[in-house]
């Protein structure tokens, strides 16, 4: 592969950053060698406690057990809201940007406090108490954050289901976590279209007799079906409640939320996060990874239905007293300039999005970026999947005008917060690399026998010891936690991802371990081949899978989406094969290339590779559930034009 270009830390940034290179290495060494001392200091620095802890941490990876700050007590909303009021009551906590560019709102910390307390009192009036589970099925409106924080205020456990999920998916999650209350809206708005949330909720709840209350936020004012025994309008319920709600003091290890993540097989896993450790991970990573400075406007484009929205729209920024932007819309509505127009409108300093969005916007051309100023931007970030170097360079050069470092963050729903990531003032950047571990994170690379790979090498990525934001259990099924994360390599947390470590100790995520190609006995990650394909200026996006090959065992099947206006032909096909040969070697030449107008993606933007593998293998009768796809019709096109008949 071509040698990556190194982007050194700008001197001016290093001089004013929270963490410079020397401090990173000193503090990282302390976090590994003296973890109890290091984490106790950080827990006192970042969080406000009602009662101190007895022990900082204990863990047993053979049993999948971990506790942090045991015996300590705190409330999440006191940390996110109340403690800021003496100095920040009139500062903006949340900027809300509606789907319609002419609609926005600013919510101060005082207004946030009052809204959360009123919402919490509505929940209490419906019988919700500490430890009860509450399901949230909402659009990206401020009330989604209020609902989360209202649960945390009274010690209830929230389970957010992304507003794009089907009634069936919603029902499964309500049943699994035994939620008695559901919070939703009449409709959502996304890209100029209405999303029938209440109608979907009604279909789901029809199969959930345990749900006694459905609290509905009026977003569009659309007519919706109404069950007078069960349904209540939030605005009506709030008329009779107070703006004071005493916070419930929670044990550090009390549950804060359950968030479902799809398993490779079987039903979704309810990832359970607890209070103290998770909040510390959220706050620390938000401040250090984005070098957040007081008064800055921070925008994470995720939905609160995903962990990125939990940690980096709500809990991390608010714990740090930041101004966090919530966006109801999509990056391409009404035009592909929307993100950059929002950055100009609200003077956004830090912008955090997914490689999928970056590639989509890159495919639309530079003119949409060039039509805006983006002068306020200081730090850029990516999350959700590895970013290929070409998209990284475009993001850096075109969006950031070559002056904004990119934080390529690797983490998971299960880790709670960033695990491998650059820090703006400390770590030189290599496009496509998540660089180095965050404080307290001990990554290891393991071979097929579970032996540690030292120095340069490639293997399965695992974590050697506990970190504060670690998953505590799979809700209601601790055996599944052990089976999924702690049994493959006993004594380690197994991430399910493969990684390569270079001569500088930088980590490169090579894709899910089940996305490893084995061609004639040679192993390579799908991400490597995809990166080679998208080097071509006519390629917008590519996804690579293996398929059964009579000679090689596995052949390489590439799905390629071209830039807008580009017509496919055999000449281009040959150029792409040559690109892979040039970048990786002859072994990486795709055997089959299918031109794909779109790829099957979940609503969070992740490519559903299971479907790509099935189509490539011609196993069309076992495609499985496609209900969580953003556009299920994409699959029909892939099947119709498949190459391996």
Curated annotation (Swiss-Prot):
Q: Which EC class heads this enzyme's classification?
A: ligase
Which keywords does this chain's UniProt record carry? Acetylation, ATP-binding, Ligase, Magnesium, Metal-binding, Nucleotide-binding
GO CC annotation: cytosol
> So which cofactors does this thing need?
Mg(2+)
What's this protein's family per the entry?
Answer: Belongs to the ATP-dependent AMP-binding enzyme family.
Function recorded in the entry: Catalyzes the conversion of acetate into acetyl-CoA (AcCoA), an essential intermediate at the junction of anabolic and catabolic pathways. AcsA undergoes a two-step reaction. In the first half reaction, AcsA combines acetate with ATP to form acetyl-adenylate (AcAMP) intermediate. In the second half reaction, it can then transfer the acetyl group from AcAMP to the sulfhydryl group of CoA, forming the product AcCoA.
Q: What is this protein called?
A: Acetyl-coenzyme A synthetase
Which species expresses this protein natively?
Answer: Saccharophagus degradans (strain 2-40 / ATCC 43961 / DSM 17024)
Q: Which gene encodes it?
A: acsA
């Amino acid at each position: 592969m071509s040698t990556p270009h190194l982007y050194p830390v700008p001197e001016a940034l290093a001089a004013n950053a929270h963490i410079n290179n020397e401090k990173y290495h000193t503090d990282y060494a302390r976090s590994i060698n003296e973890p109890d001392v290091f984490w106790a200091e950080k827990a006192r620095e970042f969080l406000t406690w009602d009662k101190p802890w007895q022990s900082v941490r204990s863990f047993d990876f053979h049993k999948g057990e971990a506790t942090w700050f045991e015996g300590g007590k705190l409330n999440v909303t006191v940390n996110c809201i109340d403690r800021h009021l003496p100095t920040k009551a009139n500062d903006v906590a949340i900027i809300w940007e509606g789907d319609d560019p002419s609609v926005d709102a600013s919510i101060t910390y005082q207004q946030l406090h009052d809204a959360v307390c009123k919402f919490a009192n509505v929940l209490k009036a419906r019988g919700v108490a500490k430890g009860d589970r509450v399901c949230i099925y909402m659009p990206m409106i401020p009330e989604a954050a209020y609902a989360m924080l209202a649960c945390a205020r009274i010690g209830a456990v929230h389970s957010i289901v992304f507003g794009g999920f089907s009634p069936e998916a919603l029902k499964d999650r309500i049943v699994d976590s035994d939620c008695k209350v559901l919070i939703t809206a009449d409709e959502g708005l996304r890209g100029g279209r209405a999303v029938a949330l209440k109608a979907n909720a009604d279909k789901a709840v029809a199969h959930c007799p345990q749900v006694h209350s459905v609290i509905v936020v009026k977003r569009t004012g659309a007519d919706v079906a109404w069950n007078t025994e069960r349904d209540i309008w939030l605005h009506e319920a709030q008329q009779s409640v107070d703006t004071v709600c005493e916070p419930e003091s929670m044990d550090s290890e009390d549950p804060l939320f359950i968030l479902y993540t799809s398993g490779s097989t079987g039903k979704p896993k309810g990832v359970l996060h607890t209070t103290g450790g998770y909040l510390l991970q959220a706050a620390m990573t938000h401040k250090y990874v984005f070098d957040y400075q007081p008064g800055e406007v921070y925008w994470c484009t995720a939905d609160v239905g995903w962990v990125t929205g939990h940690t980096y729209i709500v809990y991390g920024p608010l714990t740090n007293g930041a101004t966090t932007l919530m966006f109801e819309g999509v990056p391409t509505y009404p035009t592909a300039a929307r993100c950059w127009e929002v950055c100009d409108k609200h003077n956004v300093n830090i912008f955090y999005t997914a490689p999928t969005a970056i590639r989509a916007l890159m495919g639309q051309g530079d003119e949409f970026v060039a039509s805006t100023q983006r002068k306020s931007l200081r730090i850029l970030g990516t999350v959700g999947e590895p970013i290929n170097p070409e998209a990284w360079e475009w993001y850096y050069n075109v969006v950031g005008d070559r002056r904004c470092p990119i934080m390529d963050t690797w983490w998971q729903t299960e880790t709670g917060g960033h695990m491998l990531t650059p820090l703006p003032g400390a770590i030189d950047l290599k496009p496509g690399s998540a660089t180095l571990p965050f404080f307290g994170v001990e990554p290891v690379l393991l071979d097929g026998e579970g032996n540690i790979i030292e120095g340069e090498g490639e293997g399965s990525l695992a974590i050697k010891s506990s970190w504060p934001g670690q998953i505590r259990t799979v809700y209601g099924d601790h055996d599944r936690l052990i089976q999924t994360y702690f049994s493959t390599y006993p004594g380690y947390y197994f991430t399910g991802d493969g990684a390569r470590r270079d001569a500088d100790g930088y980590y490169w995520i090579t894709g899910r371990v089940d996305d490893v190609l084995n061609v004639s006995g040679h192993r390579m990650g799908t991400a490597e081949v995809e990166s080679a394909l998208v080097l071509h200026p006519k390629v917008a996006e590519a996804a690579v899978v293996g398929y059964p090959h009579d000679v090689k065992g596995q052949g390489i099947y590439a799905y390629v989406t071209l830039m807008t206006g580009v017509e496919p032909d055999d000449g281009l096909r040959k150029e792409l094969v040559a690109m892979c040969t040039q970048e990786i070697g002859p072994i990486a030449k795709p055997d089959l290339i299918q031109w794909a107008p779109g790829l099957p993606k979940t609503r969070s933007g992740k490519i559903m590779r299971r479907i790509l593998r099935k189509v490539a293998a011609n196993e069309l009768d076992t495609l499985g559930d496609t209900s969580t796809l953003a556009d299920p019709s994409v699959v029909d096109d892939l099947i119709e034009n498949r190459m391996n008949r």
